[in-house]
Amino acid sequence: MTRTAPSSLRSLPAEGAAATDLLDTLQRGLAELDAQGLRRVRRTADTACDAHMRVDGRDIVGFASNDYLGLAAHPALVAAFAEGARRYGSGSGGSHLLGGHSRAHATLEDELAGFAGGFSDAPRALYFSTGYMANLAAMTALTGKHATIFSDALNHASLIDGIRLSRANVQVYPHADMAALAALLDASDAETKLIVSDTVFSMDGDIAPLAELVALAERHGAWLVVDDAHGFGVLGPQGRGALAAAALRSPNLIYVGTLGKAAGVAGAFVIAHETVIEWMIQRARSYIFTTAAPPAVAHAVSASLKVIAGDEGDARRAHLAALIERTRALLRMTRWQPVDSHTAVQPLVIGSNDATLAAMRSLDAHGLWVPAIRPPTVPAGTSRLRVSLSAAHSFDDLARLEAALIEASEGQTRRDAEQPPRSLRSLPPEGAAASLGAARRETAA
């Protein structure tokens, strides 16, 4: 009996042709990224995450990580990680619903709810392996075709991807524009309304108007989901986060936090009313269909919470606050445009990709790792250096950064002076000479 190939396969090109076509397409795409100065390159750390590291075989001062409290190499966390591995082994062995949920995970969830759940009368926490997975869960499990999501234009990519997967209607409001958001809410008759916002925006460092967001959510019967990835551990009393810093409480709140930044370990969590969390356990695909994080990680996070909430955490936050104010001042000494940020994220907007990469390379030559952030992470024309501060930094580190930034800024000024005006660069040589002569005559007159 002769079998006929499925119709979906009959139109495929000859063997190997499809693979070759794909490789050609990808190679052209990579070449375009190179031409635009947009290819990203990984650097390899040879030592623990800290202010002073060895990266790609060189000693550097790092201003790239999100280790805001300098806990990633803290002896107490390292010891707790080792203890957790001895007690629970190296892996969880399964998903949370199929054998992988350990006592370490359960204990951590209780601790997180008590630590950062003060905004709710009945808080419960759910631990995830990554912040990306936590945001996907919040967006997809709690919405659907019946819902409308109102999303800040500068929300993190993980929120945006979760929104796309949710199948909900989407309304994007201009960044932090509460009047625009109010108008969208007024016009909506959706059965379920979900307002979604970062607290600290990761590329600008500014903080969302949280009190106004809560008020709008309550006025319109909406839920408010806040992603406090860059605020948890740093903002508020004892580092309890952005909601605690603003003294906000509401039954309409859902709080997402991450544990690989200020907490110095890994993972993320969602805190909400216990009914919301129980529903997420039943319906959040990014929670259900993945192996649970190693219990040793959760055990180390429990140790981190003790440091964050204690006197040492207060001292680290105070030092970080002083570093932030000093950095704000030194960034204003360059030719570029600092963003008005009062958080550990201190961006310096340069503009073009080429100029931003040149500044990054200039700093790198001085042993300073300050990453260049380019599209699509930020809008075209706003490429920037992102100075990320840690309590592990010293004021001597900032003095080195200041000197190197001033040199990079002056170098850009010299390069600009050496180039002809933009209007002349595309002219042929004879036209350029004639136009330049005319310009000189006009100036002399």
Curated annotation (Swiss-Prot):
Catalyzes the decarboxylative condensation of pimeloyl-[acyl-carrier protein] and L-alanine to produce 8-amino-7-oxononanoate (AON), [acyl-carrier protein], and carbon dioxide. Keywords: Biotin biosynthesis, Pyridoxal phosphate, Transferase. It is an enzyme of class 2 (transferase). Pathway: Cofactor biosynthesis; biotin biosynthesis. It catalyses: 6-carboxyhexanoyl-[ACP] + L-alanine + H(+) = (8S)-8-amino-7-oxononanoate + holo-[ACP] + CO2. It comes from the Bacteria. Belongs to the class-II pyridoxal-phosphate-dependent aminotransferase family. BioF subfamily. One of its GO terms (biological process) is biotin biosynthetic process. This is 8-amino-7-oxononanoate synthase. Substrate binds at residues 40, 156, 377. It holds the Pfam family Aminotran_1_2. Pyridoxal 5'-phosphate binds at residues 131-132, 202, 230, 258. The modification N6-(pyridoxal phosphate)lysine is found at residue 261. Residues 408-445 are annotated as: Disordered. Its EC number is 2.3.1.47. Its cofactor is pyridoxal 5'-phosphate. Homodimer. InterPro entries: Aminotransferase_I/II_large, AON_synthase_class-II, AONS_Archaea/Proteobacteria, AONS_Proteobacteria, PyrdxlP-dep_Trfase, PyrdxlP-dep_Trfase_major, PyrdxlP-dep_Trfase_small. The gene is bioF. One of its GO terms (molecular function) is pyridoxal phosphate binding.
